[in-house]
Curated annotation (Swiss-Prot):
GO biological process, one term: transmembrane transport
One GO MF term: metal ion binding
Transmembrane domains' residue ranges: none
Function of the protein: Part of the ABC transporter complex FbpABC (TC 3.A.1.10.1) involved in Fe(3+) ions import. This protein specifically binds Fe(3+) and is involved in its transmembrane transport.
Keywords from the named record: Ion transport, Iron, Iron transport, Metal-binding, Periplasm, Signal, Transport
Effect listed in the UniProt record for changing D24A: In strain: PAK12085 and SB33
Sites where the protein binds Fe cation: H32, E80, Y218, Y219
SUBUNIT field: The complex is composed of two ATP-binding proteins (FbpC), two transmembrane proteins (FbpB) and a solute-binding protein (FbpA).
Keyword Repressor among record annotations: no
Gene Ontology cellular component list: periplasmic space
Protein name per the record: Iron-utilization periplasmic protein
Length: 332
C-alpha cells in the first residue's frame, strides 16, 4: 500500500514538473493592449506558459530592440504594423518562422516576410468616417486622392503620425509614384485638419468639428459596440476598387533570434496564428482575422469585399522614403 502511494506521489510530481517545464516569455507589445492581453491570457490558459507584456509604441519598441541587440530580454515582438519588422529583419535580429505557421494566415493580399522571419496576424482597413447628418455616401470620393483637394478644405481630418498613415504613403508611392504621393500629402496639409490620434479624429466627427476623417476601421467598430450604432452620428465609407484609400495594414509577430526561450516563443507565435488565438484576438478588437475559419463578432465588412490593393511587404527603405515624403510635405 505504501509502495502504491509512493508511485502515485511520484507520478503527481512528474506531472507537475511537466506542466511547469516551459519557461515564461516576455513579449514586447506594440499591438493595442486589450488585444494583446486577450491573446496572452488565452495562451496562458492553453499552455500554462506565463506571458509578460512590455507594451509601448511599435516604432519605439523596434528601436529599443535594435539597441538591445543580442542582450534583449524580449522573446517575441508583437506589433500593430508589420512595417516595423523591416529594420529588425535587415539587422538579422529575427528568427525564422515555420512555413506551416506562416501558411495559417496566408490570404490574398496579406504580406509575406521576404526572409520568413515574421508573420501577419490580423488586418485593419483604411476608411473614411463621415457625419451622416451632414454627408451621405454619394458625397464620398471614389479615390482617397480626391480628399486632398480644395473641395474638402476644412472638411477632412487626418492623422499623419499613425503607422497606418505611413503605410498608406508607402502604398501611394509604390502604386502612383512619388509625385502623386507628395502632392497628396501637401494637399492634406493645405486643406485638411490634423489630429493627434485616430480616436481623436473619430471623436471630432462625432462632435461635429469636421464632417469626415481618414482613420482605421476598428476605431469606429469599437465605438459602435460601446455606444450602439443608432447613437452615433458617424458612419463608415469603404473606398474599395484597389484604391490606396482601401489599403489594409496588418499586425504581426516575430521571434527574436536572441531569445533564450525559442521553443516557448515559437509556441506563442504558433498560437497567435491558430484558430483559438485568432478568435481571442478578434473578440477583443475589431480587426480582421486572417484565417478563413474565424469570424469576427463585430459584424465587420467582409474581408473579401474590401477590394484592398495588393502591395508588397514594406522594407526599411520603403519606410525611410515615405518618412522623407511626409517631412518634405511639412507634416513632421
Amino acid at each position: 500500500m505504501q509502495f502504491k502511494h509512493f508511485k502515485l506521489a511520484t507520478l503527481a510530481a512528474a506531472l507537475a514538473f511537466s506542466a511547469n517545464s516551459f519557461a515564461d516569455i516576455t513579449v514586447y507589445n506594440g499591438q493595442h493592449k486589450e488585444a494583446a492581453t486577450a491573446v496572452a491570457k488565452a495562451f496562458e490558459q492553453e499552455t500554462g506558459i506565463k506571458v509578460t507584456l512590455n507594451s509601448g509604441k511599435s516604432e519605439q519598441l523596434a528601436g529599443q530592440l535594435k539597441e538591445e541587440g543580442d542582450k534583449t530580454p524580449a522573446d517575441v515582438f508583437y506589433t500593430e504594423q508589420t512595417a516595423t519588422f523591416a529594420d529588425l529583419s535587415e539587422a538579422g535580429l529575427l528568427a525564422p518562422i515555420s512555413e506551416q505557421t506562416i501558411q495559417q494566415t496566408a490570404q490574398k493580399g496579406v504580406p509575406l516576410a521576404p526572409k520568413k522571419d515574421w508573420i501577419a496576424l490580423s488586418g485593419r482597413s483604411r476608411v473614411v468616417v463621415y457625419d451622416h447628418t451632414k454627408l451621405s455616401e454619394k458625397d464620398m470620393e471614389k479615390s482617397v486622392l480626391d480628399y486632398a483637394t480644395p473641395k474638402w478644405k476644412g472638411k477632412i481630418g487626418y492623422v499623419s503620425t499613425s503607422g497606418a498613415f505611413l503605410e498608406q504613403v508607402v502604398a501611394l508611392s509604390k502604386m502612383k509614384g512619388d509625385k502623386v504621393a507628395l502632392n497628396w500629402l501637401k494637399g492634406l496639409k493645405e486643406n485638411g485638419k490634423l489630429y493627434a490620434k485616430n480616436s481623436v479624429a473619430l471623436q471630432a466627427v462625432e462632435n461635429g468639428e469636421v464632417p469626415a476623417a481618414l482613420i482605421n476601421n476598428y476605431y469606429w467598430y469599437n465605438l459602435a459596440k460601446e455606444k450602439g450604432v443608432e447613437n452615433l452620428k458617424s458612419r463608415l465609407y469603404f473606398v474599395r476598387h484597389q484604391d490606396p484609400g482601401a489599403l489594409v495594414s496588418y499586425s504581426g509577430a516575430a521571434v527574436l533570434k536572441a531569445s533564450k526561450n525559442q521553443a516557448e516563443a515559437q509556441k506563442f507565435v504558433d498560437f497567435l496564428a491558430s484558430k483559438k488565438g485568432q478568435e481571442a484576438l478578434v473578440a477583443a478588437r475589431a480587426e480582421y482575422p486572417l484565417r478563413a475559419d474565424v469570424v469576427s463578432p463585430f459584424n465587420l465588412e467582409p474581408y473579401e469585399k474590401l477590394e484592398a490593393p495588393v502591395v508588397s511587404a514594406t522594407t526599411a527603405q520603403d519606410k525611410e522614403h515615405a518618412i522623407k515624403l511626409i517631412e518634405e510635405a511639412g507634416l513632421k
